């Protein structure tokens, strides 16, 4: 079962950057009721901050059940096909992440480990499908839109899951350096400026801590 206590407090959504607490809970409930291996990617992004391209490129060999960690060392994207003789204008490529910092190992929450154990298959199979066939990011984004619609949540970009993870993590008192490394960022400054969206409630809670000095 996915722990709702990890949802955190209500957040102020700026340009639909993150899910609200209510939306967060609705999405988790929907995934619990309808879970299949395709939806594991949503959990990896929402609870571990994994990018959509990284999610789509994952294979079961990237999951270490002994150390309960996930290895991120590749990403999938659709790019322009420069071959003039090619039938299609674009093609799917799987390559190393955009920066050295993006290559990382992330501890997997125990409830996700337990879900993974139920679907574990051959190491060369893709995580999202359990087969040799992958799901590309554009298709997975469309699948995510369907999940939102079926759970009654207003449309939001998949990348918002990563922003939601970062913001909830700060609210749960993650130290910023650990969070930055989990996200695969080049600097702590970038994490704070681009990925953390504190609510008025959270800011007030922090300000009230100053009362101890009165």
What is the meaning of each model-derived region?
Residues 18, 76, 113, 183-208:
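Catalytic-site neighborhood detector that most strongly recognizes the C-terminal catalytic loop/helix
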Residues 10, 14-37, 47-50, 58, ...:
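Long, amphipathic, Lys/Arg-enriched alpha-helical "connector/arm" segment
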Residues 1-8, 13:
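Single conserved hydrophobic/aromatic residue that forms the stacking wall/gate
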Residues 30, 82-87, 193, 197-214:
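DNA/chromatin major-groove-contacting recognition/catalytic segments
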Residues 57-118:
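Conserved tyrosine-mediated DNA breakage-rejoining catalytic core shared by Y-recombinases
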Residues 25, 29-38, 48, 106, ...:
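Short, basic (Lys/Arg/His-rich) helix/loop patches that form interaction surfaces
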Residues 39-56, 69-70, 167-168:
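Short pre-functional
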